[in-house]
Regions:
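Short, strongly hydrophobic transmembrane alpha-helices
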Residues: 20-45, 343, 351, 456-481, ...
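Interfacial "coupling" helices/loops that link adjacent transmembrane helices in transporter permeases
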Residues: 18, 304-344, 707-749
Length: 824
């Protein structure tokens, strides 16, 4: 009995006898370990991909943006940059012209495409290869080509590059002809992105859908010709030497521009101010926190389940351990057999866990390559992450086996021979039920008494299932919350005018100008309201947020925002904020804050100004950037009687798309989009995110089923003598099965309750903390639908209640005399 061969043979005998249980527990453990290992690589993948992509295209360190509506002669910004004291810190610089436009094209299947876009006029340069990506365009914020080419010369028509996700979403395949606002056309010869367009920044900011907006990269001189602004720019991008003081250089730039170009308002920002840069890095970090929480919960559920089930399996062998002790065997030798079973489960769990982890890894790798908007995606295998998770998975079953073995070999033989609930000293919490009037007779009360008779076992089973149910609840709740947010935005923006369109003009116009009259008098327009849309900032104390100011028309407007508190702005110094904006700034109706905005100082010249304004009220749109002011407030910006946008309702016989196409060719129009475009873009992004959530929820449900099955199987082994006694006294199979179902049902209800409470808490953290850091502009509505609650009930209560049915075959084939025999 001392040789390893003996123990291996005995271990093999146990494996053949209990292989379904060992494999099932191993699979439970493998699910937790594999998911933790697979999800653990996401942050490193995304950060490495971000670093490589931004580095390959030489992202700017500083950017100088002229105030909206301001344009500077070509070379003026470069001259100012070269005149600063630290000019030698600048290693590369490039001027640009960036303006909104309308894209009209035809998809590969003949479908017309009309969406807003953005002309990005940049310097051209020779193509070069960086990390396997063909890079072209300017030396700063270069264009990385995914397909095609971009040759700015030797072609009769202006050549352009479109965003690849936009082209894929709309079926545009280069070479293709695309028409821009004003009737000009360009030839799309390639698809690519630049650092500032990795995340689409359309009229809805980071919430613009990939297929609803695209930059159009063209040579700088072509952009000047297409937009009617010859020899003009409005943007400068610079790269500094490593280790340079960015803030000092930015201050020098502002002073020099103010000296050389008086009256010109500019904003100097750095890399961290790029919305796409912030989102990509913050999203990688916060998503990993979210995945770590879910992986931890699933791994915790697997750990609780494995610990409980292995412990109960070992304790089911206590009778055999007691017999061995009575025969004089040393406790340490009696411990070898159950520890070997723990080792078997550890090996099975790690092997299957690595397989599951690799499968999850491969799935996520493909998902990142398809959805990550980067020219370089690094998804190499993270062996360290796998080794760490595998080590955890290997230790869990060994520790789970060691605890009951230590307890088993420290008792007297007669105590070890006792089986079932009698091995629990004091009957657990069962005496408490003596003071609780339970309905029914002794048989009807047995399930409840069994649950409290061994509280440690019950708690472990409930916690294991509850932790995994919490993952399903919180993940499903995230989808519900996003959908509720989209629904609220759609309800707000489409009320009273479901077909409403928003027209962006290519510059500021007098409201009585022929250009505005041409748009409002078009046959495609039923009614229209002129308005002024200005980018600005609101500041209260140390808090500052970016907003989009919209003036409200007088009379009977096409659309007005809903007032959730206070009233619509009446005076020029009143603003109506989103509820989320008021919350972030810590203000309410009647309080004051500072408005930082551009103010016209002359044709094509704007300066930055500050105005104290009063909060007139709030509106319920979940996006925090829409801010509304009275029409008279245009004088605050130095633009009385001037407009640059219109809200309109299409003619009765026209659809929204038909009206877009009809308006796109009119002079002065930069873009036309549906009022619901923002919500539609968010819904499109939700579909991409939902695929990840659904897979994790499916894995969680499978793990709950495994926990329920294993718990039932162990219960059947542990209570075999009790069941045999019931059969000996004449109880039918259905009565014994009903007792098992009710007992599991009670634990399922407890697990579901814990899962719902924990899941709602996690959902609150995700919405109010995690998402708030990544997407502060979105006031996500916390929501948990009845469907998600039903899913939790099915995963918890349903799985636990139905699992005992799987033991019917074993109960029918039970040999009652052999089962009741104490010693063979």
């Amino acid at each position: 009995m001392r040789g390893p061969r003996f123990w291996l043979l005995w271990s093999w005998r146990d494996l053949r006898r209990r292989w379904p249980l060992i494999v099932a527990i191993g699979l439970l453990l493998a699910g937790g370990v594999g998911l933790a290992a697979g999800l653990g690589s996401m942050r490193d993948w995304r950060v490495d991909s971000n670093d490589a992509s931004f580095g390959a295209l030489n992202v700017h360190d500083l950017r100088v943006q002229a105030e909206q509506g301001s344009f500077i002669p070509t070379g003026a910004l470069l001259d100012a940059a070269e005149a600063i004291p630290d000019a030698d810190e600048i290693t590369a610089a490039s001027e640009r012209l960036i303006l909104p436009t309308q894209i009209t094209a035809v998809s590969g299947d003949g479908r017309p495409v009309t969406t807003p876009g953005q002309i990005v006029g940049v310097e051209t340069g020779p193509a070069r290869s960086v990390d396997g990506v063909e890079v072209t365009g300017p030396p700063v914020d270069a264009v990385g080509l995914k397909s095609g080419e971009w040759q700015a010369t030797d072609r009769p028509r202006t050549t352009a590059v479109l965003d690849p996700q936009y082209a894929d979403g709309n079926g545009i395949v280069p070479p293709a002809r695309v028409e821009l606002a004003g009737g000009a056309s360009v030839e799309v010869t390639g698809l690519g992105t630049s650092p500032e367009t990795f995340v689409v920044q359309g009229p809805g900011g980071a919430f613009s859908g990939e297929s609803e907006f695209s930059p159009v990269f063209v040579p700088l001189h072509s952009a000047q010709r297409l937009t009617g602004r010859p020899d003009r720019v409005n943007d400068l991008a610079l790269v500094l030497r490593p280790g340079s003081d960015h803030a000092a250089v930015a201050r020098q730039l502002e002073r020099e521009i103010d000296r050389k170009l008086p009256g010109l308002g500019v904003t100097v920002t750095d890399t961290d101010d790029i919305d796409g840069y912030r989102i990509l890095y913050d999203d990688a970090e916060n998503d990993q926190q979210l995945f770590d929480v879910f992986a931890f919960l699933i791994l915790a559920g697997a750990t609780f389940g494995a610990f409980n089930l292995i412990s109960r399996t070992v304790e089911a062998q206590r009778r055999e351990i007691g017999v061995g002790m009575a025969l004089g065997l040393e406790p340490r030798r009696l411990a070898i057999r159950p520890m070997l079973m723990g080792l078997q489960i550890a090996v099975v769990g790690v092997l299957f866990g690595v397989v599951v982890g690799l499968a999850v890894n491969e799935w996520l790798r493909g998902l990142l390559i398809d959805q990550l908007p980067l020219p370089i995606v690094k998804t190499d295998l993270r062996s360290g992450t796998f080794a760490q998770r595998a080590a955890i998975g290997f230790l869990i079953p060994l520790l789970a086996a060691a605890w009951p073995v230590m307890r088993g070999v420290r008792v007297t033989p007669i105590e070890a021979i006792r089986s079932g609930f009698r091995s629990s000293r004091g009957g657990g919490l069962a005496p408490l039920l003596a003071h609780v009037p339970l309905p029914g007779g002794s048989l009807a009360q047995m399930p409840a008494r069994n649950v409290v008779r061994a509280p440690r076992r019950t708690a472990l089973t409930v916690l294991a299932s509850g932790a995994v149910v919490a993952v399903a609840v919180s993940m499903s709740g995230m989808l519900d919350s996003f959908q509720a947010t989209i629904d609220r935005n759609t309800e707000e923006t489409l009320k009273t005018a479901p077909e409403r369109l928003t027209v962006t003009l290519d510059r500021f116009y007098d409201e009585r100008s022929p250009t505005v009259a041409t748009v409002t008098g078009s046959d495609a327009v039923a009614t229209a309201d002129e308005k002024l849309v200005i980018p600005a900032k609101l500041r209260s104390g140390d808090e500052e947020i970016e907003v989009s100011l919209n003036t409200l028309p007088t009379g009977k407007p096409v659309w007005t925002p809903t007032v959730s508190s206070g009233h619509l702005p009446v005076r020029p110094d009143e603003v109506l904020l989103a509820e989320s904006a008021a919350s972030d700034l810590g203000v309410e109706a009647g309080q004051s804050l500072t408005l930082v905005h551009p103010r016209s100082t002359g044709p094509g010249r704007f300066e930055s100004a500050e105005t104290e304004v009063t909060v007139s009220g709030t509106h319920p749109d979940p996006f925090r950037f829409p801010v509304y002011m009275a029409s008279a407030s245009s004088s605050v910006f130095g633009l009385p009687g001037v407009v640059n946008s219109l809200d309109l309702v299409p003619a009765r016989d026209l659809t929204g798309d038909a009206a877009k196409r009809s308006l796109a060719g009119l002079p002065g129009i930069a873009s036309v989009e549906s009022a619901s475009a923002l919500g539609e873009s968010l819904e499109q992004g939700l579909e991409d995110f939902a695929s990840i959530i659904r897979v994790v929820v499916a894995i969680a449900v499978v793990l709950v089923l495994l926990i329920a099955f294993n718990s039932t199987a162990i219960n059947a082994d542990e209570r075999a003598r009790e069941h045999a006694t019931m059969f000996a006294y004449g109880l039918p199979l259905r009565s014994v099965l009903r007792l098992a179902v009710v007992e599991s049902l009670i634990m399922g209800v407890l697990a579901t309750a814990i899962g719902l409470i924990l899941g709602v808490a996690i959902l609150g953290w995700v919405v109010n903390v995690n998402l708030k850091e990544v997407l502060p502009e979105l006031g996500t509505v916390t929501s948990l639908s009845s469907g998600s609650i039903i899913l939790a009930a099915l995963a918890g209560v349903g799985a636990m209640a139905l699992a005992p049915v799987l033991t019917v075959r074993r109960l029918r084939r039970m040999d009652v005399p052999s089962t009741l025999r104490v010693v063979e």
